[in-house]
């Protein structure tokens, strides 16, 4: 038996049905996939899309628009292209590529999109900053005056790095480039201690960007940083060799963005790009697939701009808070927190082939940066580690950031070593050397031994000044070269225990007055005699 609907009920039923109807309309700007493969998609229909804008593909795959052409747009995919097929719908997001930033990122391993990949749960942050951003203008910058200590004697003495500088680390594979960068991160631990901050030390937050590395290598780096307590103030951004080329291409920009968050809020950050050679290769792959015209070594014409726009973002910002808030391209999300006095220091790494620094990418990055640390296979294999070739390594702006005590003791160090290298080659041919030449060879040999340093044992700057003073003043000339490193360890331990006042004076004053020099010389000479009696047979 059917229930008849009475005519007077119809209007009430219709009114009830229509009351639940949602009249809002969702408007999407959509396009269609014309072609997909090798991490690239060509899309028809997204006529109003912007370059660098994120687009949404099916199966939660995100892409970024790089090519804008008359009849289609070219996008790179940050996920697998196997899931996407011809005819799929693509949505505009109207959002330029950005990552979440904040203190919650410290101690975590993330991918270049800011998503955690360390299995420690979600990261809660409120601020997002764009991956691409114009570098600060000239009026918002401040000269590099403050040192960034690496803890490596060879670098802090002869190739000093200042906060806000760009210093290239360049060398063949297996010469210790990553080790120099990791030692620098570990050395920043001293700036995070309570005692250091009470004395006015400004902590340095670190970002390590691993581009195109093996996943096992990245895991090893994270393990080393955790072991030395350095992950507390470090973020690792990883785009491994197995990740899509577009992720490898954007990874350094993600590192720069995170570093800018600390820089623009009045703090200090250090970002390490390991390495930009692999980023250039990933960008070349993406560009060729997008059918951009190739240039030298098949790199696209804008490969210089790829690195220059990244490295120019490293800067020391003016101390004027009001001026810092007016900085060009400062995102609205960070404006209320903006402060002056911050810095972003960049240590890009470039891998050379058979020591050829005149190749395309190495010469590009050398011309962009404020100096380079050149590591050599021959030095590495001969046992000099870190294997820094002091002759062609240079820091163009770090000299003004060096502490006075270090500048004084290391003033002649570069010249002494250069003369030693020259004489060493000459001495191989003849045995009859005059006394002055023999003295120079003896002094140089001791200095080379002093500059050797183990991995993951960065040294405080006051200890560096003390041991370099002993070496450059010729106090160790009578000690056999093979005992120099043993003497160094014992001497610094003795200073720490019995003459802490000398180290404290150097640390607080940043220089050595005549009294400190006299006292240090006496202590060193006395200890040398005792050491010789115990060790020289």
Curated annotation (Swiss-Prot):
Catalytic activity: ATP + H2O + 4 H(+)(in) = ADP + phosphate + 5 H(+)(out)
Protein localization: Cell inner membrane
Superkingdom, natural source: Bacteria
Record's GO cellular component terms: plasma membrane; proton-transporting ATP synthase complex
SUPFAM superfamilies, A to Z: C-terminal domain of alpha and beta subunits of F1 ATP synthase (SSF47917), N-terminal domain of alpha and beta subunits of F1 ATP synthase (SSF50615), P-loop containing nucleoside triphosphate hydrolases (SSF52540)
Keyword Protease appears in the UniProt entry: no
InterPro entries reported in the protein's UniProt record: ATP_synth_asu-like_sf, ATP_synth_asu_C, ATP_synth_asu_C_sf, ATP_synth_F1_a_nt-bd_dom, ATP_synth_F1_asu, ATPase_a/bsu_AS, ATPase_F1/V1/A1_a/bsu_N, ATPase_F1/V1/A1_a/bsu_N_sf
Feature type site, description Required for activity: 393
Matching Pfam families: ATP-synt_ab, ATP-synt_ab_C, ATP-synt_ab_N
UniProt keyword Nucleotide-binding present: yes
Membrane topology: Peripheral membrane protein
Recorded GO MF terms: ADP binding; ATP binding; proton-transporting ATP synthase activity, rotational mechanism
Residue numbers binding ATP: 171-178
Gene3D superfamilies from the UniProt entry: 2.40.30.20, ATP synthase alpha/beta chain, C-terminal domain (1.20.150.20), P-loop containing nucleotide triphosphate hydrolases (3.40.50.300)
Recorded family membership: Belongs to the ATPase alpha/beta chains family.
Complex formation: F-type ATPases have 2 components, CF(1) - the catalytic core - and CF(0) - the membrane proton channel. CF(1) has five subunits: alpha(3), beta(3), gamma(1), delta(1), epsilon(1). CF(0) has four main subunits: a, b, b' and c.
Annotated function: Produces ATP from ADP in the presence of a proton gradient across the membrane. The alpha chain is a regulatory subunit.
Protein name, per record: ATP synthase subunit alpha
Organism of derivation: Chloroherpeton thalassium (strain ATCC 35110 / GB-78)
Gene name in the database record: atpA
